[in-house]
C-alpha cells in the first residue's frame, strides 16, 4: 500500500486519467473529489462490496435458472449406494 500525505487542495494522480483531490478535513472525516472518465466506476468500498455481492447472487440465480445445479458429489455414486 502506498501511503501519501496531502493537504486540503492538493491532488494525487492514479494513472493518467484519474485525479483525487483533498477538498476538506473536518474532525476524523476527509472530503475528497475524484475526477475519472465515465467508463471508470468510482464507488465507496461498502457500495462496491454490495455491488459485488449482488452480481454474485445474480450469477448464481442464472445458473439455477439454466438448470446448472452445483453438486459436491458424483451423481452416479449417490444413486448406486
Curated annotation (Swiss-Prot):
Principal location listed in the UniProt entry: cytoplasm
A single GO cellular-component term on record: cytosol
Specify the domain of life of the species encoding this protein.
Bacteria
- Region (Disordered) spans which residues? 59-81
- Subcellular location(s) per record: Cytoplasm
Gene3D superfamilies on file: Translational regulator CsrA
Against Pfam families, the record matches this protein to: CsrA
Q: Which UniProt keyword terms apply here? A: Activator, Cytoplasm, Repressor, RNA-binding, Translation regulation
Positions with biased composition (Polar residues): 59-71
SUPFAM superfamilies with a match to the protein in the record: CsrA-like
Listed GO MF terms: mRNA 5'-UTR binding
Q: Name one GO biological process term.
A: negative regulation of translational initiation
**Family membership:** Belongs to the CsrA/RsmA family.
**Subunit structure and binding partners:** Homodimer; the beta-strands of each monomer intercalate to form a hydrophobic core, while the alpha-helices form wings that extend away from the core.
NCBIfam families in UniProt: csrA, PRK01712.1
What does it do? A key translational regulator that binds mRNA to regulate translation initiation and/or mRNA stability. Mediates global changes in gene expression, shifting from rapid growth to stress survival by linking envelope stress, the stringent response and the catabolite repression systems. Usually binds in the 5'-UTR; binding at or near the Shine-Dalgarno sequence prevents ribosome-binding, repressing translation, binding elsewhere in the 5'-UTR can activate translation and/or stabilize the mRNA. Its function is antagonized by small RNA(s).
PANTHER family (alphabetical) = CARBON STORAGE REGULATOR (PTHR34984:SF1)
Protein name (database record): Translational regulator CsrA
Organism expressing this protein natively: Psychrobacter sp. (strain PRwf-1)
Amino acid at each position: 500500500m502506498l501511503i501519501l500525505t496531502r493537504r486540503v487542495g492538493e491532488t494525487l494522480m492514479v494513472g493518467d486519467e484519474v485525479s483525487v483531490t483533498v477538498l476538506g478535513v473536518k474532525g476524523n472525516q476527509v472530503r475528497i473529489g475524484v475526477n475519472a472518465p465515465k467508463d471508470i466506476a468510482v464507488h465507496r468500498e461498502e457500495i462496491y462490496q454490495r455491488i459485488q455481492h449482488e452480481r454474485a447472487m445474480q450469477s448464481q440465480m442464472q445458473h439455477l435458472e439454466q438448470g446448472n445445479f452445483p453438486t459436491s458429489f458424483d451423481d452416479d455414486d449417490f444413486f448406486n449406494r
